[in-house]
A protein has these predicted regions:
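Signature for HUH/AEP ssDNA processing cores
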Residues: 1-94, 98-116, 206-218
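Structured loops at beta-to-helix junctions and adjacent beta-edge loops in soluble globular domains
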Residues: 36-38, 81, 99, 153-158, ...
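Short conserved micro-motifs at the rims of enzyme active sites and ligand-binding pockets
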Residues: 45-47, 162-168, 286-287
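Long, charged low-complexity interaction segments
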Residues: 89, 97-99, 185-273, 278-281
Length: 303
């Protein structure tokens, strides 16, 4: 159904034609584990056309075999993203939903998902920089651990192109395992977040160095934004910023030639650029002063 998505966490109260901001308990333990694999080239490729649920199952079974226990033995539900089958070189996007035997803290789950990018060979070998150059583009996105996260599951509307899947239902598969749930608690007990963070920072430095960029030494200031404490990056790289569109509330940007439309600011306040990628928000003026000045002039009646 058009527009359908999964809200990762339980809502505090019903939502009706309003923002979901602040409506979920960000610290509530979760029993839903989602692996969001983005721009991933699997070992077992999907066919270029005529993709069925059986094809999807075979691909996911091969991916699951690379995962650590207890995921390797657990059943999961697979959902192919809207771009799957449309990109070159067999690159796909997948959501894998696992049910946990016991609820776990979101913060621990976030670190563990980040660590999967280093301990799964197929993930680690495909890591690269985000377009901003200031963060790693994870194969397995840790942002989906958040209780407030939306996970888009609707089949795409195909206009002028042929759907590579036989039917919308073929974008889904129940991939049976030895157990219906998985118990992450023993694994999370031994998790050291500082170790994961160090590996993440080293990976970022190595990827930046490979592109001739210096090591990023981030500087932050803590700001109160809409009642929330936010760490804002005050020394971003110089960025190419392209305004894509504006709505009544927000302006959306692409960075360094990207096409995700994942960066945004309130129309009337261009000071801080936020994003949907899990990167730290940054000061627009520091990233591109010319664009900042242009925006302030262009939208001065709304600022």
């Amino acid at each position: 159904i058009k527009g359908h998505c999964v809200h990762k966490g339980v809502l505090k109260e019903p939502i009706l034609n309003e923002s979901r901001r602040g409506k979920s308990d960000s610290n509530a333990p979760t029993a839903l584990l989602v692996l969001d694999l983005d721009d991933y080239k699997p070992e077992v490729r999907l066919p270029a056309s005529g993709i069925t649920s059986a094809h999807l199952t075979a691909t996911v079974e091969a991916i699951r075999a690379e995962l650590p226990e207890p995921l390797r033995s657990a059943s999961c539900i697979a959902n192919a993203s809207s771009s799957t089958g449309m990109k070159a070189d067999g690159v796909i996007g997948l959501h894998l939903f696992f049910l946990l035997e016991h609820s776990v803290p979101v913060s621990q789950l976030t670190h563990w998902l980040t660590g999967l990018n280093f301990c799964v060979e197929g993930f680690q070998s495909q890591l690269k920089l985000n377009r901003s150059g200031m963060s790693v583009k994870w194969v397995c996105d840790p942002v989906v651990a958040r209780n407030s996260q939306l996970i888009y599951i609707s089949a795409p509307e195909m206009v002028g192109v042929t759907d590579p899947f036989v039917t919308p239902a073929d974008r889904w598969a129940l991939v049976q395992g030895a157990t219906p749930t998985c118990n992450l608690l023993p694994t999370l007990v031994n998790l050291v977040p500082a170790t994961v963070q160090q590996v993440a920072e080293r990976t970022l430095s190595e990827l930046r160095k490979s592109l001739g960029l210096k090591t990023l030494k981030p500087s932050y200031r803590r700001m109160d934004i809409d009642g929330e404490k936010v760490q804002v990056l005050t020394n971003p790289d110089q960025l190419q910023m392209t305004l894509i569109r504006t709505t009544d509330k927000y302006a959306y940007w692409n960075i360094n030639g990207g096409d995700s439309n994942a960066y945004y600011n309130p129309v009337g306040n261009p000071e801080i650029i936020f994003n949907f990628k899990g990167e730290a928000p940054f000061e627009m003026k520091r990233a591109n002063e010319d664009v900042y000045n242009w925006y302030c002039e262009q939208y001065k009646t709304q600022i």
